[in-house]
Amino acid sequence: MKASLLKKLDVLSDRYEELTALLGDAEVISDQTRFRAYSREYAEVEPVILAFRDYRKVQADLEGAQALLKDSDPELRDLAEEEVAEARGRLAALGDSLQRMLLPKDPNDSRNVFLEIRAGTGGDEAAIFSGDLFRMYSRYAERQGWRVETLSENEGEHGGYKEVIARVEGDNVYAKLKFESGAHRVQRVPETESQGRIHTSACTVAVLPEPDEQAAIEINPADLRVDTYRSSGAGGQHVNKTDSAVRITHIPSGIVVECQEERSQHKNRAKAMAWLAAKLNDQQQAAAQQAIASTRKLLVGSGDRSERIRTYNFPQGRVTDHRINLTLYSLGEVMEGAVEQVIEPLLQEYQADQLAALGD
């Protein structure tokens, strides 16, 4: 392990001792705000320190076993060789675990997301593929135990969607889906193609973390134009009776959001406002990330939605993620929701990139 990382762990050990003392201090205990803050920090630091103590113990065991390698007794040397090999293996595993614990935490990882899928070049075929992608992500969400709620949809003339917006709720949704933003390209023979020619179409996907508290994003009511209209979505006969659908325009940014899936105008407005907050937050984050990217560009995770990130080739049964040069010949499984086949290698590559930078 790098000396710089060991130094960080030593500093963290000192902080752990300090937190232990603070949490036993009567003055801190009487101040619930400080007590909760220190308790949260303690809970985050403790697993790292316990692992670091194990690391130091195994390190001492290794040094002791190595000293015995010089012993005159051959049986003792053989035993020491076994202990050295075992200790080195445990030390390497603990070192890897500690490095991952020290990786910078993305504060958005635990959040729900707004998933936006839009048809790009390719006309009807692009809209159909948008529908396929939405189905793929919905199946993946089912596997993860997440809940998918459609907020807005604009259906294509021959199936699929020109645009579909959904909220995905569950554990660590953003952590899994954050690298799906970008341009997704499909190569296949459309059902309407009589000559059997392969067509290329594209869709864009955007994954926006839902802010924890809408209040964190300052939205001036004077900056909003709110329009209501009769829903053309779900709701049966009710949709013909009231203007329950809501469209909100944020005038300074030009961002427009709408929700028509609920029968209640109040619920549609609340969901549209949450989505607007996410889009404004995303706009702020994008500006900050651009500044970081100019200094150091990560292999995975630039989040540029104009970037072509993946190709789905149906004739070959192939899916290729261009960011990490990953090619799989299990397109059918992926389209049925096994997106983890692509997501997990992306996450591993991102972690490897972070690990390489750790301690710099």
Swiss-Prot record:
State the function annotated in the UniProt record.
Peptide chain release factor 1 directs the termination of translation in response to the peptide chain termination codons UAG and UAA.
Q: What family does the Swiss-Prot or TrEMBL record give for this protein?
A: Belongs to the prokaryotic/mitochondrial release factor family.
A Gene Ontology molecular function term for this protein is: translation release factor activity, codon specific
Q: How is it modified after translation?
A: Methylated by PrmC. Methylation increases the termination efficiency of RF1.
N5-methylglutamine is found on 237
| One matching Pfam family | PCRF
Say if the entry is tagged with keyword Flavoprotein.
no
Give the keywords, sorted: Cytoplasm, Methylation, Protein biosynthesis
Q: Which GO terms describe its cellular component?
A: cytoplasm
This protein is called Peptide chain release factor 1
SMART domains cross-referenced by the UniProt entry? PCRF (SM00937)
Q: Where does this protein chiefly localize? A: cytoplasm
Q: Localized where? A: Cytoplasm
